[in-house]
């Protein structure tokens, strides 16, 4: 897809991978609708518009989608489902509230956003949905059962919907990033950021690479890890 002039929705745009993705898309000529709970700091561009949206609530997603089409036009070409969060802890000490918060954001929110854009993408017979999962969607991790469960769900959802919409000219790509330098690790005891991590810009570059492939060329899954693991102190 030639991204010049295309309209892209990026969820979780406030920081990290979402912010980096919005910036790279703008550099490629796209018009970007950034959805998030707070406006990203320092992102000013005549082709960027922020729409407040908490993806945990379907009504908020529907309102953001309606507002996006009203402000940027009916055709939506790209959806990057990036909004997500992770909470760690052993299962027997994990709060039900935290469990539901993760599923509401990582799984239900992704479903709401995808459901919103699909009718328009089907009508135009063109679109690309990129779902940001995690390495945690490919293997279990100690004290991360809830987070892993949400990302395995994203994996299954992506693989299924790809088969549903491929004949409508719509691509679905699922990314599985490894350790990335964001604030994800701030709330996880005993887990610290380290110098070997990938940067949000690395993930954003991979997203754009997948988006810019020729029409009949489709990257279904992308698994990314740092070349070198964390050095042991």
Name what the model sees in each region:
Residues 7, 14-15:
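Conserved glycine-rich cofactor-binding loop
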Residues 90-91, 98-100:
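Substrate-binding pocket helix/loop in short-chain dehydrogenase/reductase
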């Amino acid at each position: 897809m030639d991204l010049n002039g295309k309209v892209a929705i990026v969820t979780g745009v406030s920081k990290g991978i979402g912010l980096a993705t919005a910036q790279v898309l703008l550099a490629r000529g796209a018009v970007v609708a950034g959805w998030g709970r707070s406006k990203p700091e320092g992102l000013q561009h005549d082709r960027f518009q922020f729409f407040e949206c908490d993806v945990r609530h379907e009504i908020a997603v529907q309102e953001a989608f309606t507002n996006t089409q009203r402000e940027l036009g009916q055709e939506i070409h790209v959806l990057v489902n990036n909004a997500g969060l992770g909470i760690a802890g052993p299962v027997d000490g994990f709060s039900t509230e935290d469990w539901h918060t993760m599923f509401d954001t990582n799984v239900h929110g992704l479903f709401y956003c995808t459901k919103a854009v699909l009718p328009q993408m089907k009508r135009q017979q063109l679109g690309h949905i990129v779902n940001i999962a995690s390495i945690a969607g490919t293997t279990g991790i100690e004290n991360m059962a809830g987070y892993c469960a949400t990302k395995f769900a994203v994996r299954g959802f992506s693989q299924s919907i790809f088969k549903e919409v491929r004949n409508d000219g719509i691509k679905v790509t699922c990314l599985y990033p490894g350790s990335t330098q964001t604030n994800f690790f701030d709330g996880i005891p005993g887990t610290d950021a380290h110098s070997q991590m990938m940067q949000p810009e690395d993930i954003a570059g991979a997203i754009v690479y997948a988006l810019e492939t020729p029409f009949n060329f489709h990257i279904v899954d992308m698994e990314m890890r740092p070349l070198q693991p964390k050095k042991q102190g």
